[in-house]
Amino acid sequence: MFEKVNPKHPDKIADRIAGAIVDLAYTQKEDPKIAVEVLIGHGECNIIIECDNDLTLNKVAIQQIVNRISESEPKLNLKIVPQDVHLAANQNDVLKCGDNGIFKGMPITDEQETLTNIAYDIYEKYNSDGKYIFVADKLIICQSKAGKELNEEYVDAKVNPLGYWTGGIDVDSGATNRKLGSDMGDAVTGGGLHGKDLSKADVTVNIYCHILANKLGKEVKACCAIGDEEVLGCSYEKMIKIVKEYIKDIGGFEKLAEWGLIRP
């Protein structure tokens, strides 16, 4: 049983905006400290950023990111605040886990891979908001701006049960980290995957567990406390390097947000 959404789903638009802002932070510092929350919809985009004092994240640059990804010009309500001094001090000497967390990485299943590829193929054709479900042999396709030809292509699927719909951020609001099931499948996390730098265990340990689970072909469980320098027998500094390379290969944090860890 698996649900997948495409990059134009409102929640993924929020994730992508948050990811793009993190990408911007990484152009300014090698190891920035940043956390981004995005709520977008109905002509407004609300963003709260907690970050290093020396990051220069100006409103013009962020508005450009919002406009590009949302393909609109929503009113931007932006609040940028410095990272808490105690959290910042945690990273003074060496890179350590920036928060507490529980994690379980899981191998990608055939069902998840199949549905993700179906979602990608449909998205390539329609390039608009879509959500898809695969349960055993039952396929449900909710694809905005799609005509009857989609029914003809997927004759055994349940396609758009309510008929034609437009979708997008003028129909539904989007928020960061609200589609973790789509991003991570059977994996378990105590926190969100998007809008955070690599000092945040919710990003780094989640992705490391995912990489390891798919390499070993079995579940990988981990937990950490804020300030831990080692998880699963691996130094956090080394773990960050591994995950940074993984994200670099994908194309950055914005690209990670498009499809999550289960990718076409």
List each language-model region with its residue ranges.
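A domain-level signal for the structural core that forms small-molecule/cofactor-binding pockets
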Residues: 1-264
